[in-house]
């Protein structure tokens, strides 16, 4: 009995696309599945589609075949070696093709990305809230990567690390193919010092609050696991880890630099109970798990202001531009892996919720 081969869509191999970028967007690559991998509707009786065009139309655009036809008409469906395919090109299982996806309408997102540092190897920018780092899901053109490739005229740009879409702050991009690996290894080996700023309630637990307000800060440990297709991470507190015999895999040092009790209207606007003091947090992650900082402050009973995932997932809706996640990638320091120069970067952005404190002080005076 022959087992079906798994469907394959390649992503990570460093192949040279046979199509140039279009408006900062790379073509996608797709390995044509074997008939036994396809549903009956695409391979009736176990027979492969007659042509590549038939397959692409049936799988992706059955209601608008002209989208695929137009790609073939403009020579924008190709093999690895650059061979231009036509609507009559036969379907060959295992063959890799390249083409441009059809872009859906995307809402216009912020484009202000001031340059914090640049040399011939690397570009550091100050990312705004709500702008994704890379194309993903419904955001393709409206991403930092796509916008920067167009703005800088550099199709080779790739991010060295990532920030969540709601998070603002310092973000690095490699400018050349040769620079990618040294900078990626720098992050992989944790040769980077990072701090974040956040605005969140002061922990209700007096001991946790006292430690967070101390010069040493509060060390938060937990075990975090990202579950596929689940928006929140799964997290065990340090106490739960001990009880279950599980090793913590995350560590953050959280220090509260200042506190401020907002007026009731501000508290209500941010979804925080009135009368509870807020803190300006300095967060130093010693590990780099998904949503680590957001999950750790939520674990303290002090979720970051503007968080739509913690403590509960809020319904989808338009971005709340007046109330973004109050999390900022504030500083990034490292020894340049190519030149050896010490580099220290700092975001020029501020957190809007904390600016309310400053405006309240000005109004009072």
Which ranges hold each PLM region?
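RNA pseudouridine synthases
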Residues: 1-365
